[in-house]
Amino acid sequence: MKSDSITAYGDKDIQVNKIYAEGNFGDSILKIGRYGEFSSYGRIIDTEISGAEYTFEAGDLSGALTYGRLKDSRTLAGTTFENPKDTKETFGAYLGTEYSSARLKYNLSPVTAIGATYGRLNEVTVAEKGNNFQDSVNFWEAGFNTKLADNLTLMAAYSKSDLDGVTDSVGSEVVNDGWFSELRYKQHNPSDVGSFAIFTNYRNVGAFSTIDATVDYTENVRGWTLGFDYVPMENTTIEVFYTTGTQVNATSTEGRQDVDIF
């Protein structure tokens, strides 16, 4: 049985640790419990689920199969939209509880890899301006990462779902695809005191292209970020960043808002 200090939230906002059991079977691992689920590049999902995951390695190819349950009280990308007919009301696509996925990653060379993930959410409830309906939603993700030089890496990934026909607060269709790219100098490691990383990323991430992506501030945002990670003591990371951009879809009847975070 394993657990770690990263926490998630269960029913009624009770804080719980990730906790799971795992067993090795040759070059494969079976994990059962509550654990962090991560698509190939974290564009579809990077959050905790309760279920089972089977991972394997075969030379330069690795992959995983997952089935689990998510907390269903939140929306895709954590995004809700004001109802133009009544701004006191909001609507969005609320998560189904069942999630399944298959992902693959292949090392093209010692410095370059490609990856892809297929994911499926059952019974997503779309509450659009008082008209509710349920549907299963499929997600796809593909990307690559490469080492350009010593201590300099580049990654880029694209994700898309088949949830369409939903409009935002100003009547535009909610975007169901998105892409994310990042250039990073060095890598910080929480166990390596003094390690650091400098990064910049640019993205255009539609709200319906992700369940819960790595770096929440990238969801439903078109723009760029400049940041810095530093490890002052073991298991402690300080991150400072500035991000700027605009919403991909308007969550307010006043239109798309600018996004500036420091």
Per-segment meaning from a language model:
Residues 3-7, 87, 168:
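Surface-exposed intrinsically disordered loops and tails
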Residues 49-53, 82-85, 217-221:
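Short, low-complexity, polar/charged sequence segments that are solvent-exposed and flexible
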Residues 77-91:
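Intrinsically disordered, low-complexity Ser/Thr- and acidic-rich flexible linkers and loops
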Residues 8-9, 42, 89-92, 131-132:
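Alpha-helix capping and helix-loop boundary segments enriched in small/acidic/polar residues
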